[in-house]
């Protein structure tokens, strides 16, 4: 095993093998424990894209809320699933299939296009130009603004979908989809997440669909693996302590080092990870 590989595995808490049912229970109990400790909270809010990660996080959250209602008799415990399209979403059917699978208590829809376009126009008013990539990050951050607005109106906390295969590459928007209150998938790689969806009875297309952030107008539905330059299979193998090609390992480690700032709170004078 490569020296940095061992360090990364330890930092992200990845196990080489898992029991999916045990990990489902672990995440559900985690979500319930947070509510029991913070009794002022009654809802969890999650943006739903129609991909594997939000499908899994949503299913775990709904299960936690069902158990909270059963255990406390308090029907105020609700899971709010939020659709956050930029205009019309090409894979809207997948998003609705995910919502149907998870049986969300409440479903909301917020079209982020007007607010994103307004922000782009405001910044460009001085003659500067927002790149398509930068605009994609604005979309991700606007989605989180909407989720926190909904959570604020409903005594809620926001659920994030970050997992080990994203964390190692930093493949999320800082203070966008990377900004949340709880991340119940943290510690799981991509194939492990799919295994949890299988035991939860998810339709296969929800975890077999090619992962995409789908943030760029000029490159719609760009596969994550194309953007990263490495396959999720290699990322998962690396995180599980297996041998991968030097090229794959070097690509993963390059992303890990480049995106270290994303895995930290704002940097203070006491931090030295970046030096």
Swiss-Prot record:
Coiled coil: none annotated. Keywords: ATP-binding, Ligase, Magnesium, Metal-binding, NAD, Nucleotide-binding. Transmembrane segments: none annotated. This is NH(3)-dependent NAD(+) synthetase. It is an enzyme of class 6 (ligase). HAMAP family: NadE_ammonia_dep. The gene is nadE. SUPFAM superfamilies: Adenine nucleotide alpha hydrolases-like (SSF52402). It comes from Lacticaseibacillus casei (strain BL23) (Lactobacillus casei).
């Amino acid at each position: 095993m490569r020296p940095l590989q061992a360090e990364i595995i330890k930092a992200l808490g990845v196990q080489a093998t898992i029991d999916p049912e045990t990990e489902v229970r672990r995440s559900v109990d985690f979500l319930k424990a947070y509510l029991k400790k913070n009794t002022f909270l009654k809802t969890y809010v999650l943006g739903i894209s129609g991909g594997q990660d939000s499908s899994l996080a949503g299913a775990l959250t709904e299960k936690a809320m069902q158990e909270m209602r059963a255990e406390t008799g308090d029907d105020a415990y609700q899971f709010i699933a939020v659709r956050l399209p930029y205009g019309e979403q090409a894979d809207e059917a997948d998003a609705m299939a995910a919502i149907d699978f998870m049986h969300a208590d409440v479903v909301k829809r917020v079209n982020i296009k007007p607010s994103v376009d307004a922000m782009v126009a405001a910044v460009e008013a001085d003659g500067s130009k927002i790149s398509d990539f930068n605009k994609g990050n604005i979309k991700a951050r606007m989605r989180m603004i909407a989720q926190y607005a909904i959570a604020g109106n409903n005594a809620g906390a926001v659920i994030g979908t970050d997992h080990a295969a994203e964390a190692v590459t930093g493949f999320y928007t800082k203070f966008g989809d990377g900004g949340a209150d709880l991340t119940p998938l943290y510690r799981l790689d991509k194939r492990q997440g799919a295994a949890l969806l299988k035991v939860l009875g998810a339709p296969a297309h929800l975890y077999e669909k090619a992962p995409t952030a789908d943030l760029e107008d000029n490159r719609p539905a760009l596969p994550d693996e194309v953007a990263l330059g490495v396959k999720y299979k290699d990322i998962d193998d690396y995180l599980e302590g297996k041998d991968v090609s030097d090229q794959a390992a070097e690509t993963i480690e390059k992303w890990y080092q480049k995106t270290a700032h994303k895995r930290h709170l704002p940097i203070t004078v006491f931090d030295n990870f970046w030096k």
